């Protein structure tokens, strides 16, 4: 059953790579370019998973309550720090995995540091610090339990909001994007050459995230998609050789790398690219902040931003805006401010 994690990861990695589904870009673009398309796509993926998750619970296929007590201080600090990190690293947790598979050396550095710090924050020197902050919590887990309502009210609200923004975006006049003459035909063109619409990718990602639940639960791991814990587990296994660290999630992230590599190679997008020293250092720092932040927050942009939000945990919906805020702050200092200084000098 663990191999289903590998299959799920291959599908997810392939879809994210080919769809250029970047959560860092979704957060950053809302501020830098005032473009909400990728964030709407994220909402669509959350909605698809949320509807399916509660349907599976309703019919008895899933019998899990994955939400934990709300560690508010750790979530607030961690989500913000993670948001800073993903801008410096040039991609979120999953984005860093799939960009590493495309041959970006900066992403290799970010990924290594992300995995290392995630492990250090769990069982290493920073383990007690993480545990202390995570233990400052309140016994509130899900938003619908706190307010004593059915989760279906929140599902309906999320569906309405998402449908409104999807419709609003699709109603805008389409802008033709210049493209080279296709070299492939048929299925090969659709899979490896044609530009995928973010909403199409989002629906596929939502369905993969939904499928992850019963597949993962069947192995004893009561959660869906998750990147930070499995990434830390790989590092811990490599250091200790202890097989207890190998679970469904580890196969998932390895599959993401494989699927992304397949997508990049087949579409001629794989190329080893070595950035300058400044970018390497920035990517390394970004990976460190990602590992610390995601562990404190209890999840990354996938675990918290895509999955925890789908079952309406406080952790998910508090971490999401904090990750966005961290992204915007980092974008200001790395993109907006340098541009303004350059314009001021030119004038």
Q: Which positions does each model-derived feature cover?
A:
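Membrane-interfacial helix-loop segments of redox and metal-homeostasis proteins
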Residues: 1-347
